[in-house]
Amino acid sequence: MEAFALGPARRGRRRTRAAGSLLSRAAILLFISAFLVRVPSSVGHLVRLPRAFRLTKDSVKIVGSTSFPVKAYVMLHQKSPHVLCVTQQLRNAELIDPSFQWYGPKGKVVSVENRTAQITSTGSLVFQNFEESMSGIYTCFLEYKPTVEEIVKRLQLKYAIYAYREPHYYYQFTARYHAAPCNSIYNISFEKKLLQILSKLLLDLSCEISLLKSECHRVKMQRAGLQNELFFAFSVSSLDTEKGPKRCTDHNCEPYKRLFKAKNLIERFFNQQVEILGRRAEQLPQIYYIEGTLQMVWINRCFPGYGMNVQQHPKCPECCVICSPGSYNPRDGIHCLQCNSSLVYGAKTCL
């Protein structure tokens, strides 16, 4: 095991060189591992990817029901699907002299001239840029004749339309390194180099590395005495593709796809460190990755005012749906919490 030189003052220059050499060797190991990660792997494996949910495609159309309000979900600041003022039974039927009248959450008539909510010639409701305040119950009154000879029929169709956002999801990693003495500045230097290399490794994916924790502890090992170990915890999250260092224009720019690629690169990076150490003929550097200590967890978080609820929103189980009246979410939790005094959609406080 290589160690720092701690001799008399006249050997200070040699001590500095020896200590610097140890840090350099550990850094070189990181650089080589990062380079090898770029080499395509011939081994593939199948995993379950987190699924993004979108209902904003033009091909999706929502039909109503006379029995209950039909739920529809629109991504925040996006165009909505067409909300049809017909039932499934009437969708393909011939309607004579149909007329449509839409009312919004507060009983206001949705006019044809509205810039954000438009009524098509066939009576469909379409939102161009859905805002949080647009969430709520929408009602359409349909009048029509089945045939020219029959009398006018009237239907009332209700829709519960919710804003939703994709979750703020990220990977959280933990790893342990054999370290220099816990009061050594070389542990801090190594930490900085490790984060720099990981950041460069993920630069093309528009992903961000954030250090959550870095602690040095003395660990008693069975049959190995005491040793110093660095405990790292860091997160990997996707940046906005428009704001990242390198703009992502590839067809696989969805955040969860970029995060999955980042996870694979990080796993390979740490595995390469183990392989390189295994091929070394000389002694191990003082700072090195401890095999098998890399752990990761996939974390979903919703923005304040939004939450996931499989029971309430079974058609959008992985969406962060705006909190309904009677609930709120004050921070980046997963679920909306009960609040009887909350009367608005998207509440962030409970008064």
From Swiss-Prot:
Changing residue 287 to T: In SPGF66; uncertain significance. The gene is ZPBP. Residues 1-44 form the signal peptide. Changing residue 225 to S: In SPGF66; uncertain significance. GO terms for cellular component: acrosomal membrane; acrosomal vesicle; extracellular region; nucleus; zona pellucida receptor complex. Expressed specifically in testis. It holds the Pfam family EGF_Sp38_C. Gene3D superfamilies: Immunoglobulins. InterPro entries: Ig-like_dom (IPR007110), Ig-like_dom_sf (IPR036179), Ig-like_fold (IPR013783), Sp38-bd (IPR010857), ZPBP1/2_C (IPR048805), ZPBP1/2_N (IPR048806). Changing residue 184 to G: In SPGF66; uncertain significance. This is Zona pellucida-binding protein 1. It is linked to Spermatogenic failure 66: An autosomal recessive male infertility disorder characterized by globozoospermia. Affected individuals have a normal sperm count, but spermatozoa are round-headed and lack the acrosome. In addition to pure globozoospermia, some patients have a mixture of acrosomeless spermatozoa and spermatozoa with small or detached acrosomes, which is defined as acrosomal hypoplasia. The keyword Signal applies. Glycans are attached at residues 114, 187, 340. Plays a role in acrosome compaction and sperm morphogenesis. Is implicated in sperm-oocyte interaction during fertilization. It is a peripheral membrane protein. Its main location: cytoplasm. It is found in: Cytoplasmic vesicle, Secretory vesicle, Acrosome; Cytoplasmic vesicle, Secretory vesicle, Acrosome membrane; Secreted. Keywords: Cytoplasmic vesicle, Glycoprotein, Membrane, Secreted, Signal. Belongs to the zona pellucida-binding protein Sp38 family. CDD domains: Ig. One of its GO terms (biological process) is binding of sperm to zona pellucida. N-glycosylated.
